[in-house]
Curated annotation (Swiss-Prot):
GO cellular-component term (any): cytosolic large ribosomal subunit
UniProt key word rRNA-binding: yes
Assembly information from the UniProt record: Part of the 50S ribosomal subunit.
Pfam families attached to this UniProt entry: Ribosomal_L6 (PF00347)
Stated family: Belongs to the universal ribosomal protein uL6 family.
Keywords: Ribonucleoprotein, Ribosomal protein, RNA-binding, rRNA-binding
Protein name: Large ribosomal subunit protein uL6
GO biological process, one term: cytoplasmic translation
Described purpose of this protein according to its UniProt entry: This protein binds to the 23S rRNA, and is important in its secondary structure. It is located near the subunit interface in the base of the L7/L12 stalk, and near the tRNA binding site of the peptidyltransferase center.
Cross-referenced PROSITE patterns: RIBOSOMAL_L6_1 (PS00525)
SUPFAM superfamilies: Ribosomal protein L6
GO molecular function: rRNA binding; structural constituent of ribosome
Length: 179
């Protein structure tokens, strides 16, 4: 059995969870998330917690045990607190701004790159170089942050590009001169 899957998911007072077969719906103060879980796992709601158990002793069932528990935990945390990822834009002339809901990034190309957020995701820009992606679904927030970073990933020589705020760029030495 999974060590992560063994611990039950605690449900706060302001969150309601509806289990309908393999579909789990979590409603909270920030919104509602719905997810279809993989087969091979059973869910039981007891008072203010959800217990996840593998339905069989087969390998695929044990594999999904911890995954489902973590997905439910992420859904509960998303509808209560939400998730956010911060990115930094490094480089001369590189900047970002929000026009309406669209994020416009000038990252050294001949044209600005425009990104429209999916439902439930918001972009916020502070001081033209710091972008915050926030929402209630952890997976979508991470994917959107990765898409923004992929516009101009940081390069190892000067560190220019778009990077996560807590990311360390491994720097390389330049060419050594002729001796």
């Amino acid at each position: 059995m999974s060590r992560i899957g063994k611990s039950p998911v605690q449900i706060p007072d302001k969150v309601s969870v509806d289990i309908n077969g393999l579909t789990i719906t979590v409603k909270g103060p920030k919104g509602e998330l719905k997810r279809l879980m993989p087969e091979g796992v059973d869910f039981v709601q007891k008072e203010n917690q959800i217990v996840v158990t593998p339905s069989t002793t087969k390998r695929y069932s044990r594999e999904r045990h911890g995954l489902c528990r973590t997905l439910i935990s992420n859904m509960v945390q998303g509808v209560t607190d939400g998730y956010s990822k911060k990115l930094e834009i490094v480089g001369v002339g590189s900047r970002a701004q929000v026009k309406g809901k669209t994020l416009v990034v000038s990252a050294g190309y001949s044209h600005p790159v425009e990104m429209t957020p999916p439902d439930g995701i918001t972009y916020k820009v502070e001081s033209n170089t710091n972008v915050t992606v926030s929402g209630i679904d952890k997976e979508i927030v991470g994917n959107e942050a990765a898409k923004i970073r992929s516009i101009r990933p940081p390069e190892p020589y000067k560190g220019k590009g778009i990077k996560y705020q807590d990311e360390r760029i491994i720097r390389k030495a330049g060419k050594s001169g002729k001796k």
